[in-house]
């Protein structure tokens, strides 16, 4: 039975904590938890524990917070737990080869894409921005490469026209634990069937940057609408008006041709702020000026109509 496996869990954010909670709720034997060191957060820069640490301590589990797993003494922490398998979910530290080989069944990882598509740091955002029809989770056997290990189990879900990175994150946080528990059962009873990744199908999901989230009006309206959803809730798509950053929370595509230069404001009314793009028109529906809450285009126009005069260009 997979419940009898001695499991080390390694993870840090809320996404990982949801997986740990599922393991504990289903009766699995978690013998130790690794998570990143407490970090300064908030205006007071007070040291804050990770969501995984908070949950582990609530459940009375041993918690380890090494800065790195490269030092021999930190690797010994793993060895001393005599685990059958190590489950890694958004841990944030590199596992050296020696650590990968310590558990009897190795280390397995929950990755937020259908590998080999979107290896890397931002698979949820990249799948949305590119316009993929579906995404999912892959449970894989870890090796020394970046998301290169053999695939053990996959679960998929559609990407809807309303999905943001936030909603997809929640969907995958539901799928991941299901796939993880199934995979552990298969590993325990010897029925797991590792599948080698097809290197010809590999794509990479590079880490996001705030500068990358700045709206580039030369792109098509369809691309920009996906970008806005992909970067919600972080780092948030934004544009600049009078030297001020304005975040864009929601937009829609108006499938009408225009000869206006990209970035030209075409209309600004209660239906939205309509802007020419490289192909089509983007209708801005919800925006957030610096220091303010998100608001409808209509509410922003009531206070800042001078920002959106038809004929002016956004850069």
UniProtKB/Swiss-Prot annotation:
One of its GO terms (molecular function) is methionyl-tRNA formyltransferase activity. Its EC number is 2.1.2.9. InterPro entries: Fmt, Formyl_trans_C, Formyl_trans_C_sf, Formyl_transf_N, Formyl_transf_N_sf, Formyl_transferase-like_C_sf, GART_AS, Met-tRNA-FMT_C. Attaches a formyl group to the free amino group of methionyl-tRNA(fMet). The formyl group appears to play a dual role in the initiator identity of N-formylmethionyl-tRNA by promoting its recognition by IF2 and preventing the misappropriation of this tRNA by the elongation apparatus. Belongs to the Fmt family. Gene3D superfamilies: Formyl transferase, C-terminal domain, Formyl transferase, N-terminal domain. NCBIfam families: fmt (TIGR00460). (6S)-5,6,7,8-tetrahydrofolate binds at residues 113-116. This is Methionyl-tRNA formyltransferase. Keywords: Protein biosynthesis, Transferase. It catalyses: L-methionyl-tRNA(fMet) + (6R)-10-formyltetrahydrofolate = N-formyl-L-methionyl-tRNA(fMet) + (6S)-5,6,7,8-tetrahydrofolate + H(+). One of its GO terms (cellular component) is cytosol.
